[in-house]
Design a protein with these regions (language model features):
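Short amphipathic alpha-helical segments
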Residues: 43, 106-109, 147-150, 175-179, ...
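Cysteine-nucleophile active-site neighborhood
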Residues: 134, 139-205, 211-213
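Catalytic beta-strand/loop cores that center a nucleophilic Ser/Cys/Thr
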Residues: 202-239
Length: 239
């Protein structure tokens, strides 16, 4: 959604136009929109459903009621695979893929980890039997509370193997430990989200893209370690 689309890009790194990229990846787009006005609406009303269309439908009820259901199985890897580091293997890590960004596995490999990427249907018993040095729970889409099976598997892993959850993985860990999550009125989006270390004096500038948060008051088995400096919401928990 843009105010004005450039049809003749000139950057030396550009391989194709925005229009060609969107068509190649089957992504809808629209130009000529007053994006500042849209921003003001979202600022006051919060996150809402929207549609790109050539005419306003007579009945908006289906649009208002629309919601994405069970998205994690749609974006997970269908089969396990392993990525090796360039040098010696220092650790073996299982990365449970709930919609993982490639950079997570890439950064683990840089640190000497052999990363086995597992589908979201992975069983806790199989993970423990494989003897991994640690388990990484990836980012992913949707309402964390809908992932009942994944939460149960994480609960079986708690206290038995070192774990680190990021984004959805962090939220699922909190749910597995008895906490709860809720939808943010204003999701955290962008590359400049400030996060405070509650046990120190540092504030980190982070990249975020999530619309749900862990309820800090429900984290009984852990301690809130990081909080968003803008709205005070939970950003990280130590268990």
């Amino acid at each position: 959604v843009v105010r004005e689309a450039c049809s003749t890009p000139s950057n030396f790194r550009c391989a194709q136009t925005l229009d060609a990229f969107l068509k190649e990846n089957n992504i809808p787009g629209i130009a000529g929109i007053d994006t500042r006005a849209v921003t003001r609406i979202l600022r006051e009303a919060g996150t809402m459903n929207a549609a790109i269309c050539d005419a306003v439908p007579d009945d908006l009820a289906p649009l208002r009621a629309y919601r994405i259901t069970d998205p994690v199985p749609q974006v997970t890897t269908p089969e396990p695979y392993t990525l090796q580091p360039e040098g010696s293997v220092l650790h073996r890590v299982a990365l449970i893929d709930y919609g993982a960004k490639r950079n997570i596995a890439r950064e683990l490999c840089k640190r000497g980890c052999a990363v086995t990427v597992l589908p979201c249907s992975a069983k806790a018993e199989d993970i423990l039997a494989a003897g991994y040095d640690g388990v990484m729970l990836s980012n992913g889409p949707g309402d964390p509370a809908e992932n009942v099976y994944q939460i149960e598997q994480i609960r079986k892993l708690l206290g038995k193997v070192p774990m680190f959850g990021i984004c959805l993985g962090h939220q699922l860990t909190a749910l597995a430990a008895g906490g709860s999550t809720y939808k943010l009125k204003y999701g955290h989006r962008g590359v400049n989200q400030p996060v405070r270390d509650m046990e120190g004096v540092r504030t980190y500038i982070t990249s975020q893209n999530h619309g749900y948060a862990v309820d800090s008051d429900t984290v009984k088995l852990g301690k809130v370690r990081f909080a968003n400096a803008n709205d005070g919401t939970c950003e990280g928990v130590d268990y």
